[in-house]
């Protein structure tokens, strides 16, 4: 495809893990341990190709006990070697409160602003000319209403499937506007 569309260079991006502060993740780490590993991995990749962009894991979401401190610790160690920090957020309406549910796009906006402040704080502390940007790479309306046990070794089991409503679509639209 690259040749067909006459693209000179392919954008290369590497995620340096996923939700590493989450105990459910294989390879879960404490912030310092993860940040040192991510810093070294990012530097090694960029030695082979300096156009590679790397994404350090932010906290799994803003409700984690690690949120804020995780971002600060990771960026304090790896700020100048990474290009992005990841953000993840999923919302549900378990309470059936439409007004509060639709207002979650405002919470998403605050989440973004908080991570920007942390990035700017670390940049200032380090007197860095480099800017770490945001990679909001996981977000949606998602709830586990159909989170039934799946029989082991079954063929094409239904997993993590939900029925979404117009209300859910409205929040997704508001979240898209927030991202813009």
PLM ranges: what are they?
Residues 1-15, 20-24, 28-32, 44, ...:
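A conserved hydrophobic secondary-structure block that centers on an alpha-helix together
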Residues 30-178:
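Noncatalytic carbohydrate-binding groove/subsite architecture in carbohydrate-active enzymes
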């Amino acid at each position: 495809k690259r040749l067909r569309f006459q693209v000179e260079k392919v954008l290369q991006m590497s995620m340096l893990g996923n939700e590493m502060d989450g105990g459910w993740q294989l390879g879960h780490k404490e912030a310092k341990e993860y940040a040192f590993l991510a810093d070294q991995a990012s530097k090694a990749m960029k030695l082979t190709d300096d156009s590679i962009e790397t994404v350090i894991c932010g906290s799994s979401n803003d409700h984690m006990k690690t949120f804020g401190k995780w971002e600060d610790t990771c960026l304090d160690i790896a700020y100048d070697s990474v290009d992005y920090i990841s953000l993840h957020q999923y919302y549900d309406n378990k309470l059936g409160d439409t007004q509060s549910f639709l207002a979650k796009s405002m919470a998403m906006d605050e989440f973004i602003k908080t991570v920007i402040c942390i990035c700017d704080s670390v940049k200032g502390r380090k007197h860095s000319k480099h800017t770490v940007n945001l990679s909001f790479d996981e977000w949606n309306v998602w709830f586990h209403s159909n989170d039934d046990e799946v029989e082991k070794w079954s063929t094409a089991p239904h997993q993590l499937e939900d029925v979404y409503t117009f209300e859910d679509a409205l929040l997704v639209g508001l979240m898209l506007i927030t991202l813009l």
